[in-house]
Amino acid sequence: MKKKLIAASAGVVASGALFFGGAPYYFGGQAEQVLADQYRLLQENGFLTVESRRYERGWFESTETLEVRLKPSLLNNAGNYLPDNLKTVLSEPVTVINHVKHGPFADGLQPAAARVESEFRYSPEAGKVLKRFFGEQAPVTLTNTIGLGGGGRLNLSVPAFDYEELSGIALNWKGLSGETSYTSGWAGFKSNYQAPLLHIKLADKGDIRMENLQIGSDTYDSPSKLAVGSSSFKLDKLSLQWQEGIDYNIKLNELVNLVTDLQIGAFINPTGTVPPSKITVSKLQFDTRMNEEGGWANTEGRFRFDRLAYGDENYGPLDIEVAAEHLEAKSLLAIKRTMAEVASKNMSEDEIQKALLHTARNEASGLFTGNPIIKIRTFDFTLPKGKIHADGQLSFNGLSKADLDDVSLMLKKTRADFKFDLPEPLLEDMAVSQARSLFTVNPEDEAAGTASMEDINETLRLMVKSTVNVMADNGYLTLKDDNVATRVEIAQGQLKLNGKVFESEAEPEFDDEGAAP
């Protein structure tokens, strides 16, 4: 009996020794595969370059060493918009040392294949900049808990800091934290991250404040290898304040040319100066969703906020929901590849625009020829002078690749149906705002009181009001209580307003006989 007990005990001890001795090596192989998949994703992304990788496999512990950096071309393209301190940090390579402990209890009592703790080593130049903000704290803490089935969980945190310069520039950052859970092979992953507060004080020029930022996503690969799923961006409050005027020039003509190839003069571009003021937006939210079935993708997005205060005026709520349906998946992948190529090269804005337009007309032409449908499900915006509402859809039917070079052919195969309802005073304000870039008043006349911009503004308001009244009389729109409503339809190249075919007035003809001597 004793012999049997001793033999059984020896068997248990041997089995335990085999398990606890062999399991770490087995799970070490599993951890190596997960990190190899992660390395593949890093190589495929359009933002980072992995300059080197080394993996040292051990029985109980392993080490992965990566040297990564932001792609120089991406930094060059965005460099003009970044402060020098940030450019210094982003332009230097970072060495990431992943310390891997593997075994069934690598994460303590919770069963796991491995636990990875990442150590970040920065160049001396980048380290000096980061130390000014974070002090002796590690700027980033990252751990990766690899599960028994090949999936896992990444936990990321960036510590808080309070930084101030003698110049009056100050940053108050309350940190960032969150996690990403992933499935085996990184075929899908879910992320949730939070940042409680960022307050940037730009000395006497203004300040920026963001409160309670939350970012989430649920992403997986579609059959065509599109990254589909959902995402969410939430911000409780955003405040912007500036003490100096800000000049702007929105190049709408270039946007129209990019989409339609029509050459339109710069006169349509809104230009001007935004005077010193403050903007506060509350409960800002942006959600997206995308899926694919049978090689066709459907996507939708919703943008909204509760309130926007600009100076002494309040706007909102705003609710915009749009969708794009029946989009060719392989065309979307072509656009994705082009955008990745653009990010990897040092290109001017014109070159980027030409590259995207070339792809849209060639490899991604299926986005137009696949009978897509663009929908505005809702557009509701409350203004101080009334409310805006719009809904409708635009579709292309039977377009060919050759049609993309002929606007008239495109229009014949375009169907649109939109409803608009907006306050007439808004149209007046838009005309006055646009006129600021087209008209000026002689300073001498303005000083003498014989002319002023207010005279021009009042003339424009009367012109808009007169045009609206004439169009209402002709049945092209409905005017009620200073609200303008109409329905815009395009079919077979024909435009209808309020159900009536729109006919522009003929230009007056002049001849030599009718001319004054």
Where are the language model's segments positioned?
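Glycine-rich, small/hydroxylated-residue low-complexity segments
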Residues: 7, 11, 19-517
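Positively charged n-region of N-terminal signal peptides that target proteins for export
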Residues: 1-4
